[in-house]
Amino acid sequence: VAVPGGINWDELSWEEVKPQVWRKVFVGERLMMILYRFGPGCRWPEEQHEAEQGGYILKGKILLRLPDEDREIVLGAGQGYWIASKKPHAWEVPDEEVMLMDIFSPPRFELLGQEQR
């Protein structure tokens, strides 16, 4: 599936994490990449974690909430985001399917092999 310099995402299977949430996961030594698909109306509860988080929206739009700054940001296809370590954040998918690449460093091993909230 992965060779130095390349990851063949087509060879990875979609895993349903919970209703309206599917993912494909790649884990390296210091980096985790998750290709997500979210259905319309999906919400991700507020969370914070040790890992830095960045990402890129491939399709659709998300509403990113940063409660400690009292900010909401709409991000669409072609836009990205970066969330500092331990920064509270939440988001939702307003009205159409979203596909995005989430990237964590270090990897969030707690996400593997178990359902997310």
Label each PLM-derived region with a short phrase.
Residues 37-39, 49-64:
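Short, conserved beta-strand element in jelly-roll/cupin
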Residues 31, 40, 50, 69, ...:
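A generic "binding-loop/recognition-motif" signal
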Residues 33-34, 43-45, 60-65, 80-81:
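Short beta-strand segments in beta-sandwich/barrel cores
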Residues 1-35, 112-117:
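A short, N-terminal "cap"/entry segment at the start of jelly-roll beta-barrel domains
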Residues 85-110:
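Ligand-binding loop in jelly-roll beta-barrel domains
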Residues 69-85:
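Short acidic-glycine-tyrosine-enriched beta hairpin
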Residues 65-67, 92:
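A generic structural motif
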Residues 17, 32-49:
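Conserved short histidine dyad/triad with adjacent acidic residue
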